[in-house]
Every structure is written in structure tokens, then in C-alpha cells.
Amino acid sequence: MFHDLLEFNEEVLDAINDKNPIVALESTIISHGMPYPDNLTTAIEVENIIRRQGAIPATIAMHQGKIRVGLTQEVMEHLALQKEVIKASRRDISFVLSRKVTASTTVAATMFCAHMAKLPLFVTGGIGGVHQDVTMSFDISADLIELSNTPVTVVCSGAKSILDLPKTLEVLETFGVPVIGYATDEFPAFYSRSSGIPVPQRLNSAEEVANLMSIQQKLNMKNGIVVANPIPVSAELSDEEISPYIKQAHDEAKHMSGKSLTPFLLKRIAELTAGKSLEANIELIKNNAFLGAEIAIAYQKKLFSKKT
């Protein structure tokens, strides 16, 4: 039985009933992460990549008083086009549902909703983390708190490179969150494959990640797992290339804080790089969707083999 505030589309409900692998997806990338029409076309392509691999996509958002798990084309277009769509983290979920307004879900909110829907795997571009001026703003993403207490595996390209990556990893360590480098020994820096920061553990196949998820589930551990998957070589922007633009965007955003900061920085960096950072963002989320589908399939096989 599922909570009555959850509403599944037919494709996801069929997958649940047929015990097929499902990959949860966030919706903030549609409403706040990219400009139109790239946001909509990317969201559709990411879902199709997951389907082609043999899994089912479940993009999550809140609409008309329900947590929608799997979106219609109409709701996707609404998220992509409407300026009034709220960017909802965990703390906003109750308010959004009570007001019956439309909201996209951040990493934290998507993890919460995915866990409610009994979905163990979630794909995104990059997690939030500790902001660079943390000593002044104390701006630490709720994503890190959610990773510490919600058992959902998050496939990402590390944390967004606009953040303080060493401090972000320190917080994850303090919270007991495993950070796995997927076929890499260094923590990816979103637009770049390498940050120069070593990852605590490395795994090299979807089956190995699925086994880790299975062990965590057997131990009844309540935290999530970060699977850090580097951007493809062909799409990456070197640290030397992207860093000056990140610094300039930060300088321009000195008096900004809260939910509006990250969307502003991503948009401004895209402008400064003449769209190169947007192209990189699109390619890394597609790559993460491909890997996420592989892991979901391997994990479902593992679950099924235990019960036969």
C-alpha cells in the first residue's frame, strides 16, 4: 500500500506491479535548471534513455495537491514553461501539497518522495552541498541532510562545481554517507571529470553498486549513497576553462542567498560560457541516466534472485 498523497502514472504503476526496475528523476532541472526548450527536450530524452536501457523513468513533482511519480507531457510542459512553479525542498513539501500549487522537487525533496514511493534509486545532474561563502551565509544544502537519513542511492556527477567541494565531502563523511567514485578515483566536479579530491571508495560496475545497495538494505541503514559518475570526456569543461566564469558569477551574486542562488549561478555561467556549460550539463545528466538504468536493472535482478 502507498500513501494517498502519492499519485503514480500508468507506466510507473505497471512497472511496480510487474516488478520492473524504476529510476526516479528530479524535476527542478526542468523548472529552474535549464532554459526553455532545453529543459523540456532534455527531460524527455533522459526518460527515453532510461526506457531504451530497459528500465522505467519516474520523474517526480508536486501538482494539484499530489506527489506525482511519473509525469504526463502536460505537467512536464507546465514545469518547463510556467514562471510561478515553486522550487521545493523537503521543508516545502507539506506547504506545497496543502496549497495545491505546482512545485518541482530538489534532490532532497525527490529523495524523500522516492523513498515514500519505495523507489531505491534516483538520478540527477549534481547534488547540492556547502556554498563557498559558508562562514558568512551558513548556506548548506538540505540535500546533504537528506542523504544522511533517507535510504536512496543518488547517481550524480558529484556536487555542482559552484560549491565548496572539500567542505561538501567533509559534511557527507560526518553524516556517514558513502561516496562512491564510479570508475574514478577522484570526486567529479560536475562540469569537469576531476576535482583533485580523492573519493573514499571506488566501484567499477553497475553490479558492484547494486551489491552495495543490497548490503545497505540488509543492514537496515537509513542513509543514502552517492554514486559519483564523471561527465563524459567529450563533454567536459576543464577546471582552467570553467573556474574564471564560476568566480565571476559568484562575484555578481554576492548579495544573493537561498533558493534563487543556484539557478542564478547556473544561468549566469551558461551565459558567460556561451552555452558550453549548458551543453555539458545536458550531456552529464544523460550519462547519469544511462548508468542509473543499468544500476536499477542490476539491483532488481539481485532482489528477484533472492526471492526465487
UniProtKB/Swiss-Prot annotation:
Query: What is the annotated quaternary arrangement, including any partners?
Result: Homotrimer.
Family affiliation? Belongs to the pseudouridine-5'-phosphate glycosidase family.
What is the designated name of this protein? Pseudouridine-5'-phosphate glycosidase
Q: Which GO terms describe its cellular component?
A: cytoplasm
Q: Tell me which Gene3D superfamilies the record gives.
A: Indigoidine synthase domain
Record: residues binding substrate: K87, V107, S141, A142, D143
Q: How many cofactor units bind, and how?
A: Binds 1 Mn(2+) ion per subunit.
GO terms, biological process: nucleobase catabolic process
Question: Which cofactors does this protein require?
Answer: Mn(2+)
- MF terms per GO, please? hydrolase activity, acting on glycosyl bonds; metal ion binding; pseudouridylate synthase activity
Task: Identify the catalytic residues.
Answer: E26 (proton donor), K160 (nucleophile)
Query: Could you tell me the keywords of this UniProt record?
Result: Glycosidase, Hydrolase, Lyase, Manganese, Metal-binding
